[in-house]
């Protein structure tokens, strides 16, 4: 049994392949002609399931016997922004690029009179195959700051300091980040399900 990732985000593909290295993983565009998926769910879990279903349903009948579609939906929830950007994290600025999203988050926080805030990341993992639909989730707590620090990672990593650390995610090594991240926690649970589904 193989896994097709329901994402074309190169950063996510690399991170997912690293964490799921015990499995045979294919990026979306290695198996299918890429297509747009409308993420109109109201929660991370709903959006993850929408993406995994869309990719699984695009496979032909033979591929459906060989593949499980796996999707991640994740984002950052900032306390002083009443939980925003949340499920809109990837398109918070309306431009869809990481730098614009980070700039908007900092500007919104400063407008409210804060230069930092408690925040948490959420990741939902959805798996869809002939055996059914499954989902897991993970959370990472910490705070966001108003100044970018570090060169690693993507998204809001350069603004987020995990609880118990004095560095942003972008200042941590890949291994350090993967050991504490919301996505890692959700994927560790997903691995248990995948091991059962991929037997035989």
Swiss-Prot record:
Cofactor note: Binds 1 Mg(2+) ion per subunit.
Keyword Nucleotide-binding in record: yes
SUPFAM superfamilies, sorted: ITPase-like
Catalytic reaction(s) noted: XTP + H2O = XMP + diphosphate + H(+); dITP + H2O = dIMP + diphosphate + H(+); ITP + H2O = IMP + diphosphate + H(+)
A Pfam family it matches: Ham1p_like
Keyword Cell wall biogenesis/degradation in annotation: no
Ligand binding (Mg(2+)): 38, 73
Listed cofactors: Mg(2+)
Annotated EC: 3.6.1.66
Assembly behavior: Homodimer.
Name of the protein in its database record: dITP/XTP pyrophosphatase
